[in-house]
């Protein structure tokens, strides 16, 4: 249990911080929230259309990193519960503090079924995690609670285990060096059994998942409101086809952008975690733009000032440049 709950999750959090510089279709349809005006324009040409580039960065990396944290947390708890059974287990973290998990088997079936609940809590839990040859001291506090809404299949083979579950972050925070982040809010995640086309289907939705970050003294926030992610993972190629929709709002020192996301062509994502194909569009109440990804790492932004249906500017950038914008 310690391995899955503590080491796996801490490593995932550390990777997120390092990147910052320091089943059924049970997910449900979450309607987009009423879109609010943004304080900055996507179509502002200043600094090479920096606002549009930043919006593209937050659209993909903000969605990916937030979903990954919730998903890894949920999967870790499911694996831990299937291995250890009901009850509470606490462990001491290597650098001090504690990590604990509680699994409540409501029907006494000694398996994961609808109605079961779980929670995990970190109290100043410190671990040294080695990433890219460097040792990163990561401190976790707060926790998450989980509710299994539906489940079927044996947990002994998680590939054949389908579920719908809600994960709620309760001031779950991580700090490493000069970077910190805090998660709050709920995300519902569903997983299918293998489909006839040899894929696993994942759906994630959220109305209020929030991430507050402080990266080298620069603060920002991300809010998923009426947001949805659809992911088809190929069991043959182990690549994902990801579609994003709904609302993603973010605030940086430059202002806020409230984006409505649509995916015209699913994003092709491999082991690197970055798209090598596909296109996603993002719009404010005034402007809209799209980002098309290539296998070379190049990204083309097409900007439509005033949402007239005409491309008014085309910007060339790279996925690494967008990742840097998101991390800083």
What are these regions (language model features)?
Residues 1-8:
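Bacterial N-terminal signal peptides that target proteins for export
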Residues 15-19:
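C-terminal motif of bacterial Sec signal peptides marking the signal peptidase cleavage site
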């Amino acid at each position: 249990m310690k391995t899955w709950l503590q080491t796996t999750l801490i490593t995932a959090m550390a990777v997120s911080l390092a990147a910052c510089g320091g089943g059924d279709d049970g997910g449900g349809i979450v309607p987009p929230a009423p879109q609010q005006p943004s304080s900055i324009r996507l179509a502002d040409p200043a600094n090479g259309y920096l606002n549009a580039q930043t919006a593209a960065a937050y659209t993909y990396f903000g969605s990916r990193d937030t979903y990954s944290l919730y998903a890894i947390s949920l999967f870790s708890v499911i694996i831990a519960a299937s291995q250890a059974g009901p009850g509470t287990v606490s462990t001491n973290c290597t650098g001090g503090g504690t990590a604990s998990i509680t699994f409540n088997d409501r029907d006494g079936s000694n398996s994961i079924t609808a109605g079961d609940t779980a929670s995990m809590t970190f109290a100043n839990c410190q671990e040294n995690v080695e990433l890219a040859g460097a040792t990163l001291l990561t401190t976790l506090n707060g926790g998450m609670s989980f509710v299994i809404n539906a489940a079927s299949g044996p947990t002994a083979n998680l590939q054949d285990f389908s579920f719908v579950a809600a994960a709620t972050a309760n001031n779950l925070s991580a700090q490493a060096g000069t970077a910190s982040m805090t998660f709050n809010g709920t995300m519902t995640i569903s997983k299918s059994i293998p489909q006839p086309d040899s894929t696993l289907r994942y759906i994630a939705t959220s109305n209020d998942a929030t991430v507050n970050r402080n990266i080298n003294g620069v603060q920002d926030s991300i809010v998923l409101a009426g947001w949805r992610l659809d992911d088809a993972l190929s069991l043959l190629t182990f690549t994902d086809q990801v579609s994003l929709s709904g609302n993603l709002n973010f605030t940086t020192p430059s202002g806020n952008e409230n984006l409505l996301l649509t995916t015209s062509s699913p994003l092709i994502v491999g082991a690197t975690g970055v798209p090598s194909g596909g296109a996603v569009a993002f719009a404010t109440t005034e402007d809209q733009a799209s980002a098309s990804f290539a296998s070379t790492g190049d990204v083309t932004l097409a900007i439509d000032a005033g949402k007239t249906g005409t491309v008014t500017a085309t910007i060339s950038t790279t996925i690494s440049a967008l990742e840097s914008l998101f991390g800083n």
